[in-house]
């Protein structure tokens, strides 16, 4: 999978440069996320160029996002096209995933989740 990688201070933006994403391509994506996430824990996936995604690939994105959250990291998908959104809706993933209309809103989600994690860590520390 061809990806544009833009590293910011607290997160990385990954932009697939393919118009179609298949399940095979998400394996490449998962490998790249694994390598990027150890340095910068939060990832924004900008899907503005993706016009078609197969169902297995959509499921894989959901699994990858769950893996991020299990490790106290964040992954937000943004700028999905209508046809791609239809696949996520059909698979009932749209409400389970962090998907935003714009990249700016994705950044906001990442910041809010980081604050939430800090507050929860402080709360947990008080309980001990």
Question: Residue locations for each model-derived region?
Answer:
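A charged, well-structured terminal subsegment
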Residues: 101-125
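Residues that scaffold the ATP/ADP-binding catalytic core of kinase and kinase-like folds
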Residues: 23, 87, 109
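Structural signal for conserved beta-strand scaffold positions within catalytic alpha/beta enzyme cores
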Residues: 15, 99-101
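Amphipathic alpha-helical interaction surfaces in cytosolic regulatory modules
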Residues: 26-32, 36-97
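General small-molecule cofactor/ligand-binding pocket signal
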Residues: 6, 78, 100
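STAS-typified acidic loop motif
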Residues: 2-34, 47-49
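Non-catalytic signal-transmission and effector/linker regions of two-component phosphorelay proteins
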Residues: 1-6, 118-128
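Short, flexible active-site-adjacent loop segments at beta-strand->alpha-helix junctions, enriched
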Residues: 18, 81, 103
């Amino acid at each position: 999978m061809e990806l544009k990688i833009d590293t910011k201070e607290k997160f990385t933006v990954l932009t697939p440069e393919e118009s179609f994403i298949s399940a095979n391509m998400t394996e490449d994506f998962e490998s790249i996320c694994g390598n990027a996430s150890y340095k910068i824990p939060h990832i924004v996936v900008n899907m503005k160029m993706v016009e078609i995604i197969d169902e297995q690939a959509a499921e894989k994105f959901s699994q990858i996002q769950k893996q991020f959250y299990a490790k106290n990291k964040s992954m937000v998908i943004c700028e999905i096209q209508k046809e791609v959104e239809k696949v996520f809706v059909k698979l009932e993933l749209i409400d389970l995933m962090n998907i935003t209309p714009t990249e700016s809103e994705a950044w906001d989600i990442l910041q809010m989740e980081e604050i939430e994690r800090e507050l929860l860590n402080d709360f947990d520390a008080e309980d001990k």
